[in-house]
Amino acid sequence: MYCWHELYGTQWAEVEGFLVLRFRIDGSDHTGYMQPIGEGDFTTILPQIEADAAAQGEPLRLFGITSQGAELLQARYGESVALYTPRATADYLYRRSDLVALTGKHYQPKRNHINRFLSLYPDHHYQPLTTDRIEECIRLEEEWCRNRGGCHDEGVRAERRALMRAFEAFDALGLQGGMLYVGDQLVAFTFGSMLNDHTFDIHIEKADTRYEGVFAMINREFARTLPEEVVYLNREEDLGVEGLRKAKLSYHPAFLELKQRAVWLSERGRACRRLWQACFAEDKPSFVEEFLTGPYRESQMHTREVEGVTVAMAHLVPFEGEGRKIGYIYGVATLPDYRGRGLASSLVEEIVERCHREGYDAVALIAASESLQSFYRELGFEGEVPIYLHTPDGFDFGTGDVEGNKAMLRPLKDGITMPNHLVLNLLS
């Protein structure tokens, strides 16, 4: 929390004996809260937190929810809350004894990596990470950046700022770490802190990959130095990154600690859920909850009502990329009994007009069938441009086939020439 303060701006308060944490979601302007920490039923204080969120013009969004916490929420709020369990934020927990011994066939590749390291670098040694050695760690991290073309990615820069804050308050934060040398050259370091009486959390691990087996070696050596009362090592989440997931699974976790997220829904949000379930029956309920707890924004949902009932909707999702601001139209749906009345086309035109007023360069959408392609051509959309839609939480705005996603476009500015493909990032 302290180390990542610059990105998340985390604040805390005590409310009726519970610790409440408030932060910026993914470093954006949107506010989120962690599940309150304390003894008893935390849902009793949620009206106060909901009021705090409303004062900032936000719905209540809760993160880090345990399975027991989810049961309390469902019992108290029912359909007024959307709940989703993202695989990408699950923590990987390993038995410390497994990472020390590395016994069994499934750990043979790790033993091979370590044996290779021992064979190639007989002059290696390991020692605890102490504050007088921090400058060496910083130099290794800088070299790590240079080897990857520099720390230009915002995520990497944010991690570096967090690393520096950790080093500045290393002892005060109760951090413990280890350093691996070959000769007098630092080749890897790691550090973390105790989560509870029996679990140690690994915050960071950096290594010079020019040294074969270096990650396997620092992993084992640090696990060896932890006290016997440490039963589990928490190596945190994989963020949905395929390579990171593969690496974490290769150490055979004892279990994954799943964490749910929730958002409180207004009547419009509940109407979105009902309409989605009625019109897109092939989508699993979990997909709808993923959308509602993730990229869904009530202010970006356009609807049509008949006698007070929401019968049609379409969503504007803002993206940017290739030097352009693109309005992506998503989730266009009309209840079967109300189709053929021009509701969908009027919603699309309404969103196009909004995008024009708000300075978008173009509007894009993916037509799921040939008949829909014909429908959207009549509304001024054209072409089939390969499109890649990136979001912080990995939500799939396409068809499920990343390479097969083709977008139809409608330029909104004179002289705009659209590229032969689009790589777009979600705007917060």
Label each residue range with its predicted role.
Residues M1-V15, H124-D208, G269-A333:
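A conserved beta-strand-loop-helix scaffold within acyl/acetyltransferase catalytic domains
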Residues E79-C151:
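Acyltransferase donor/substrate-recognition loop-hinge adjacent to the catalytic core
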Residues L93-L99, Q108-R111, W264-E267, A368, ...:
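C-terminal "cap" of GNAT-fold acetyltransferases
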Residues E205-E267:
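C-terminal appended segment following the main domain
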Residues G69-L83, L239-L256, D361, S369-G394:
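Conserved active-site alpha-helix within GNAT-family acetyltransferase domains
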Residues Y33-D41, H203-E212, I329-G340:
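A short, internal acetyl-CoA/4′-phosphopantetheine-binding micro-motif in the GNAT/acyltransferase core
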